[in-house]
Amino acid sequence: MQQKAFEESRYPWQESFENVAVCLPFRCPRCGDHTRFRSLSSLRAHLEFSHSYEERTLLTKCSLFPSLKDTDLVTSSELLKPGKLQSSGNVVKQKPSYVNLYSISHEHSKDRKPFEVVAERPVSYVQTYTAMDLRADSLDGPRSGPGLPTSDTKASFEAHVREKFNRMVEAVDRTIEKRIDKLTKELAQKTAELLEVRAAFVQLTQKKQEVQRRERALNRQVDVAVEMIAVLRQRLTESEEELLRKEEEVVTFNHFLEAAAEKEVQGKARLQDFIENLVQRVELAEKQLEYYQSQQASGFGHDLSGHVLTDISSNRKPKCLSRGHPHSVCNHSDLKAHFHPKGRNHLKKAKDDRASMQPAKAIHEQAESSRDLCRPPKKGELLGFGRKGNIRPKMAKKKPTAIVNII
């Protein structure tokens, strides 16, 4: 009956445990080999959500025995012999090899893999457990003897191991939860820092884009300014050339004006001399005409002819002198008086005074003289001119006699 009970205590997952892969040591006893897990927590979560609470007892046996070494299982099988049942509690306390799960999980938590608890040697468990079954079968006879409660000892051992394992799993879970909380806090802190860094990066990117945009705008402004400066320089050069050309034209125009002013002054002087000579001749002609008229009125024609000859000889004095007739001047006392040095000096002074007059005055005099010449003559003047026209033929008739007398 004990052997039958022991065989009934074996689970169906123990028969196919030899084909377990090393990479995924934990499998679901209800689902089979196709559902395997790398960590104990993953298997436990699967059992909690997929199977009933009674199936968790399989998890304790499935995860306990792979962590036990061959020697530990041999010693546990030896504890079933008579005489050693009393010290089984001490042996288990001396060699709690299942506590290695906590150290393994703690080491893996340091390696940033808190969710993976890998069994030490899951394959060796199959061999050890089969050996233990054979030994248990061989020891059925002695254990079935009177006075040896083998079933109670096994049940108490399993309960003790289950309790220890549950406490260990709870401790591991608490440690893992603490570690998860710590890692969650660190992750939240790192996430916040990452968000801050990302916000700063986005802000710096925006600033960089703004700076690049301003740089492009300033580059465009600089290009436009350079083009404007080049255009203004070209315009300045053209303006300078135009100014130089205008200055040359102004200088040329000034020279032309100076030359024209000089010519105008010379022309005015010549015109003034011509007008003065003309006025003198007119005055002389008027005097001669008046004298002739007065002589004609008084009937002294001989005296008139003598005076006319003296006047003509005085007017022709330079020609006579140039021809070399000094005796003609010496024979006439009136001509000597006319060409006296004092008289010549007086005429020179008069000419100098007239030359020193302003151009406006000369122009005014010229205009007045032109007006006098161009104005219509009055009645007396018409008579005078008529008389003058009548006198000229007489004077022309008397000229040969006067010339003969001069010769």
UniProtKB/Swiss-Prot annotation:
Residues bearing the modification Phosphoserine: S16, S138, S369
Biased composition (Basic and acidic residues): 362-381
Gene Ontology CC annotations of this record: centrosome; cytoplasm
Keywords, sorted A to Z: Coiled coil, Cytoplasm, Cytoskeleton, Metal-binding, Neurogenesis, Phosphoprotein, Zinc, Zinc-finger
Zn-finger segments (C2H2-type): 26-51
Pfam family, one: zf-C2H2_FBX41
InterPro entries xref list: FBX41/ZN365_Znf-C2H2, GenomicStab_NeuMorph_Reg
Gene Ontology molecular function, alphabetical: zinc ion binding
Subcellular location: Cytoplasm, Cytoskeleton, Microtubule organizing center, Centrosome
Region (Disordered) location: 347-392
Modified residues (Phosphothreonine): T175
Subunit structure as annotated in this protein's UniProt entry: Homodimers. Interacts with NDE1 and NDEL1. Interacts with DISC1. Interacts with PARP1. Interacts with MCRS1.
Protein name: Protein ZNF365
Species of the source: Pongo abelii (Sumatran orangutan)
Gene name tied to this protein: ZNF365
